[in-house]
Design a protein with these regions (language model features):
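FIC/Doc superfamily catalytic core
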Residues: 1-274
Length: 274
């Protein structure tokens, strides 16, 4: 078969995917794609695409992310794909394979109610299984990560996509090891980039907003308030270090998926406004 007919998704005689703006340079297309999908992903932070965490849900996410780049955004590929020597699902089996994987995910209640170690373990498994299907001609990793980022949020966790983007080579290596049956590298990365939602809220939201979202954070803020009050009684040069250490201890506890114990009466008294 002539090369120009081997892949209908690329411009004849090139490896550049056909795209809406008509870019013919691969590097420029990568930059354009990254910029456009980053903007579209930002829209999903406050307005996520709802769905049943199945293929239709994944297709809707892919369409949203890549709508400015490819005409076929959100559509199942019609050509075979492989990465290195590992083939992905053939087009004829993408629908059935995805139904089976979505059913497996639903049987586990979409990973709700798990502590962080177990959540990381099961997410690594399901991500790798979905990634092996690779339903789209391009953009599978980004769409699948957004898909599981929404699933994580639904289960009470946050997946920090920016940290994955900033270590793309490491992530790609871990994904390749996962396709070969070794999930340890991807579990190690997920353990670093996944945090309980309440821990993220404690770090970045105003206290009133954080408490509205997660009332169980009351003990964490009381602990911090007590530490700040106590710090007023120690030498100035030691205050910041003491408060930072307390905040780090609270953050570590929350990152483990646990709640801070309520401060003692004495500690709470120290934290009252003077």
């Amino acid at each position: 078969m002539p090369r120009e007919f081997a892949d209908p998704y690329v411009y004849p005689g090139t490896d550049v995917l056909r795209n809406k703006p008509g870019i013919r340079d691969a590097a420029l297309l990568r930059a354009f794609e990254y910029e456009q999908t980053a903007d579209r992903a930002a829209e999903l932070v406050n307005k996520p695409i709802t769905g049943k965490f199945d293929l239709d849900h994944l297709k809707a996410i892919h369409k949203h992310l890549f709508q400015d780049v490819y005409e076929w955004a959100g559509e199942i590929r019609t050509v075979n794909l492989r990465k290195d020597v590992v083939p992905f699902a053939q087009p004829a089996f993408i629908e059935s394979s995805s139904r089976s994987l979505a059913a497996d995910l639903a049987k586990e209640n979409h990973l709700k109610g798990l502590d962080k170690p177990r959540f990381v373990e099961r997410l690594a498994h399901h991500f790798t299984e979905f990634n092996m299907v690779h339903p789209f001609r391009e953009g599978n990793g980004r769409a699948t990560r957004e898909f599981f980022g929404q699933l994580a949020r639904n289960a009470g966790f946050e997946l920090d996509q920016t940290r994955i983007d900033n270590a793309k080579d490491q992530w790609n290596h871990a994904s390749a090891r996962g396709r070969a049956g070794d999930l340890e590298p991807i579990k190690a990365i997920l353990a670093e980039v996944i945090r309980p939602a309440k821990a993220v809220s404690f770090d970045f939201d105003k206290p009133d907003d954080a408490l509205r979202k997660h009332p169980e954070l009351r003990s964490a803020f009381l602990t911090l308030k007590a530490a700040e009050a106590y710090a007023a009684s120690i030498p100035v040069e030691a205050r910041k270090s003491f408060i930072d250490q307390t905040r780090a201890r609270v953050r570590e506890t929350l990152d483990e998926g646990k709640d801070m114990p309520m401060p003692s009466v004495r500690e709470r008294d120290a934290g009252r406004d003077r």
